Amino acid sequence: MSKSLKRVRRALEDAGLAVEILEMAEGTRTAADAASAAGCEIDQIVKSIIFRGEADGRAVLFLTAGGNQVDAAKASALAGEALGKADAALIRAQTGFAIGGVAPIGHLSPIRAFFDPRLMDFDKIWAAAGTPRHVFAAEPHEILQISGAEVADFTA
């Protein structure tokens, strides 16, 4: 089991959530791939979109419904600074995850996070579990709570 997957499992256990982490043979690098593999609507997939703060260089995480896009201006306003593209090295260094497997929890460093209200419309949502092939399902309020994210409007 990878270190990334272990960190997510530990974060779930520490939060008292008894959820199953599933390995998807087809991979879940995109929201469409994940929805197909999980047998759910695309908006039930939690996309982890990371930007880099231009002022401090720190990662800012936007947890959005799979069919939504992050509006850069709204995201920057929420973050209180201009946001730029986060490269794979920054994402790996600050979260410990590779692109395509960024979980909403279990990051190497604390991360400021925002949560798409669209995700609250479902009984269950699916998120990456630390690798591009692993996912877990939980209730939206559970992921919101354990991620420490703030519900906010940042989509286009």
Regions found by a protein language model. Name each.
Residues 1-156:
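Extended, low-hydrophobicity, polar/charged segments
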